[in-house]
């Protein structure tokens, strides 16, 4: 499973020209169902807008879709999709809402507006790398907690809050196939008593 880049959550970018407002809303979406749901959400919130143009890219089936939503062909959805393509990001959708200002922009003006609004939303987004990771946990005595914590951090593990009961349970995530040396260190630290569980790999921002 290969790493890929996407965004975390949502982001907004705006552009205005000749009193027309272009509001680009960007969202993480790792399936067509999620992309369509976000599109419908934006449409419902902007029913009085003249256009709700969209473009999305999904890893699932290497899908790319766009719609000019009534704008002249290739002046709206196409430039928005091209911005997403050039970013190298995937599993995301952008919906650009246009509130018409009463003046026509022409083909060049529309392409510029939809390109700029989408680019500004991308600039505002938090870009993350999604990797194949595993979730691990280990139970250690209180006396070994700090040293185990240091080992995990030094190995690049992303730690969750520990659980303090009669012993300490440490939980963390790390990229798949990198956990081997750390597991050896934990066994050495606990003299072979560490009971470490390792999950099946899954994708997560890391």
Stretches with model-predicted labels:
Residues 148-154, 181-190:
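Short amphipathic alpha-helices in soluble, non-transmembrane regions
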Residues 1-75, 197-206:
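C-terminal regulatory domains involved in ligand/effector binding and gene-expression control
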Residues 172-181:
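Terminal, non-globular segments
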Residues 76-125:
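Active-site beta-strand/loop microenvironment that shapes enzyme catalytic pockets
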Residues 25, 53-54, 91-94, 135-137, ...:
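Structural motif
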Residues 126-142, 172:
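Short glycine-/aliphatic-rich beta-strand segments at the starts of folded cytosolic domains
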Residues 139-157:
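Short amphipathic alpha-helix segments
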Residues 158-163, 190-206:
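Conserved short beta-strand edge segments in small beta-sheet-based binding/regulatory domains
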